[in-house]
């Protein structure tokens, strides 16, 4: 393993761009592999919705491509419900994931680009009682009643 000298990392600034809501919309880090070489900018970009939730993100790898190729996808795109729950997330690295929520905001079902389907069942107190993946129950949860305190 090659250990880089600390001189390579000295005097490398970090620039941060914030919007009026104090959300970081861009950060620019600088990279150099040999002391004395010019710095190369590495830009990370975020876009937020009106509620301040991150909806689009690009790392330096795809940000630099997006400047020359208009059709370059973002690393991560998230769609939120009106209540603020992430309904759909799309990632160039991990694929897509769809979440279906219940009336109380609990996760009922999720599926992803790999074909994994996950179902959650809840009791009357909205505590999860079972998790089913690909049609098979993979988790069962049980909770003690109010009268169980006597036995502890």
Task: List each model region and its residues.
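Beta-strand elements of repeat-based all-beta scaffolds
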Residues: 1-152
